[in-house]
């Protein structure tokens, strides 16, 4: 019994997460290559390993031979083939493992900086965190443990490339699954998410259980759950929006804390005209337009923010223009407004 071979196979299988059968096959192939190198390509050579005892048998033209007589050059050939085959098996194992984890969060330690990108030690391999997938303003030091989303896994020839992300919207989604059990258990559903990494995220949630407050559960007792997520993101602001099937209600919720006076929906153009008082205008639009931009992405509507004066002027201009057309009366104009056509621009865009 070849206990030493069995021990080596067992050790490689554990360390590299490779099936033992694959390793036995690799050794048989390496011995076959060595035998062909020693005896010549024309010879009929067969190599087998007993999986229970570890005993090796090499046959040449049906005759049992001693593989230890192959010589140094043949042994070197066997070594090279074995190393190559085990590397291929390990690459396949890593590819399979991380392909299954694509879209999930993984924890690793920063190994080194490669220009503006980071190499992250994931145990059996390294992940690549490019600058474009980092949160703006964040810095990390070597040895620091960080959490990332497994964004992409691909075989690039001699190694597996694992692209990581901390700026992708799904990173937020997975963090909520980790921090909020009701999200993990699918009692609370993340219906939509819009993110500008490092600055602000809006996440719309709903609950299938009327006894569970979706917003309160995500915030946690005294804000404990949302604080953990914000801390992980380096202070990025997160607005938790209560989902509603009504577009008007959802848009209103997404623009909070701004107070909405009126919303007009134009379904043909996918445009929502939101009216707010002058005092609420900057709050609704947000810094550099961020609040309304994220609300638009969250709800799927192109949102225009107007003051009551601007809204009234648009309606007045529309009415004056329509009055010049023969046969147009108040009822027709009211129908246009009900369809979300509230100014001349809307009228032109719908092709009137």
Label the model's feature ranges.
Residues 1-352:
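RNA-contacting regions in translation and RNA-metabolism proteins
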């Amino acid at each position: 019994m070849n206990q030493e071979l069995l021990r080596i196979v067992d050790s490689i299988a554990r360390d590299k997460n490779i099936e033992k059968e694959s390793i036995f096959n690799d050794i048989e192939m390496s011995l076959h290559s060595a035998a062909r190198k020693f005896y010549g390509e024309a010879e009929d050579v067969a190599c087998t390993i007993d999986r229970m005892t570890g005993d090796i048998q090499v046959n040449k033209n049906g005759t049992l031979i001693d593989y230890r007589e192959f010589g140094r050059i043949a042994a070197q050939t066997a070594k090279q083939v074995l190393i190559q085959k085990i590397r291929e098996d390990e690459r396949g194992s890593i590819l399979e493992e991380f392909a299954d984890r694509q879209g999930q969060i993984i924890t690793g330690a920063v190994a080194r900086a490669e220009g503006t990108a980071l190499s992250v030690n994931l145990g059996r391999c390294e992940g690549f965190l490019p600058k474009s997938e980092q949160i703006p303003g964040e810095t990390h030091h070597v040895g620091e443990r960080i959490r990332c989303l497994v964004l992409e896994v691909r075989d690039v020839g001699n190694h597996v490339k694992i692209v990581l992300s901390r700026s992708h919207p799904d990173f937020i989604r997975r963090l909520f699954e980790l921090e909020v059990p009701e999200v993990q258990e699918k009692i609370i559903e993340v219906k939509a998410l819009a993110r500008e990494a490092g600055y602000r995220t809006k996440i719309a949630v709903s609950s299938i259980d009327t006894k569970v407050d979706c917003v309160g559960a995500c915030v946690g007792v005294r804000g404990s759950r949302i604080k953990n997520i914000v801390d992980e993101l380096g202070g990025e602001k997160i607005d938790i929006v209560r989902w509603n099937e009504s577009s008007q209600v959802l848009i209103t919720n997404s623009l909070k804390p701004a107070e909405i006076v009126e919303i007009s929906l134009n379904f043909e153009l996918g445009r929502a005209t939101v009216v707010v008082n002058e005092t609420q205008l900057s709050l609704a639009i947000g810094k550099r337009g961020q609040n309304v931009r994220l609300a638009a992405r969250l709800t799927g509507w192109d949102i225009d923010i107007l003051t009551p004066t601007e809204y009234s002027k648009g309606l007045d201009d529309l009415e004056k223009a329509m009055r010049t057309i023969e046969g147009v009366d108040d009822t027709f104009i009211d129908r246009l407004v009900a369809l979300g056509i509230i100014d001349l621009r809307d009228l032109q865009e719908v092709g009137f």
